[in-house]
Amino acid sequence: MPSFDIVSKMNEVDLRNAVDNAVREVSTRFDFRGVEATIELKDLTVTLRSESDFQVRQLEDLFRNHCSKRNLSTSGVEIEDEPVHSGKFYTLTMTFKQGIDQPTAKEIVKYIKDTKAKVQTSIQGDKVRVTGKKRDDLQETIALLKKSNIELPLQYENFRD
């Protein structure tokens, strides 16, 4: 029986490259001259620090731009609403999610069942397994999920006939 897995993984190498490129651009931009502005990555958490709220928002926009250039989706990112002010710095933390959490997995399963597709779904840890009788049914399910408004970037792997 054909099957595939729905996962949500962040490519850490591309994330590191996006951070490095953003740091390089910050060092050459005129509006950040003489300003202490940093972008740091640690365990899928990106920390943006600068001297003003406006500059932190500029760093966020710049970083999102570099992520999009590397085909990294920022839709599944947990981000603070307001930058935290401590001392003379404003700090904004962006945490990238790895894997599909239980509520989102249930939402994916419910979405697939509501479309009345001829497939079976099961939640297996941080991924969702989809099985069907025909390969066409699985490809139809992938197309439906790409059109859905699920907030995580989804990848499809382990496609078996």
Curated annotation (Swiss-Prot):
InterPro entries: DUF520 (IPR007551), UPF0234-like_C (IPR035571), UPF0234_N (IPR035570), YajQ-like_sf (IPR036183). Keywords: Nucleotide-binding. Signal peptide: none annotated. Pfam families: DUF520 (PF04461). It comes from the Bacteria. GO terms for cellular component: cytosol. One of its GO terms (molecular function) is nucleotide binding. The keyword Cell membrane does not apply. Belongs to the YajQ family. Nucleotide-binding protein. This is Nucleotide-binding protein lpg1167. The lineage of its organism: Bacteria, Pseudomonadati, Pseudomonadota, Gammaproteobacteria, Legionellales.
